[in-house]
A protein has these predicted regions:
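DUTPase catalytic domain/fold
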Residues: 1-177
Length: 177
């Protein structure tokens, strides 16, 4: 069986770096990535998204938008002939978020190809006038390729492996109002 890194069967690869030497989160992503990538080889209809874990218990306030850093940095590339081209990707709510009072405040995150900062969700609360707790390792969001095609995922040990860009870590309005 060909390795996923030798012959890209899929057009896109997502590279993930777990921040702050969080070994437990790293192990969770490692397990999730192994399962995700095995599905690319065995499932004729693999998932379009890759779930993102909330890295720590978080109190969400009902009176404001809640910024929740996901504890990972990412880069996505598109495989074109003999080269890999950086590309943007999407951060979508998982369908199961509808069973909670959490809502992704901007509905979908568009992550530009040059962004190398921490992946972050901005949430507000609906249907409640009280703060709520989001438990550690809850999966509220998923990363999707620009075309919603399945993609392979690679866990990297160093955020330098994601490549440096002119933009780097600027996000949420950093390029203009």
């Amino acid at each position: 069986m060909a390795s996923l890194t030798q012959q890209p069967r899929y057009k896109y690869t997502l590279f993930i770096h777990v921040c702050d030497n969080n070994q437990e989160l790293y192990n969770m992503y490692n397990t999730k990535i192994e399962h995700h990538n095995s599905q690319l080889l065995t499932n004729t209809h693999p998932d379009s998204g890759f779930d993102v874990f909330v890295p720590k218990q978080t109190i969400m306030k009902h009176t404001s938008v809640n910024k929740v850093p996901m504890g990972i940095k990412c880069a996505m590339v598109k495989h074109k002939s003999s080269q890999d081209v950086p590309c943007g990707y999407y951060l979508y709510p998982r369908s199961s978020i509808s069973k909670t009072n959490f809502r992704l405040a901007n509905n979908v995150g568009i992550i530009d190809s040059g962004y190398r900062g921490v992946v972050t969700g901005m949430f507000d609360l609906i249907y409640t006038n009280q703060e709520e707790t989001c438990d550690i390792y809850t999966r509220l969001l998923q990363i999707c390729s620009p075309t919603l095609e399945p993609f392979k995922v690679v866990l990297v040990n160093d955020d330098n492996s994601l490549g440096s860009t002119q933009r780097n870590t600027g996000g949420f309005g950093s390029t203009g109002r």
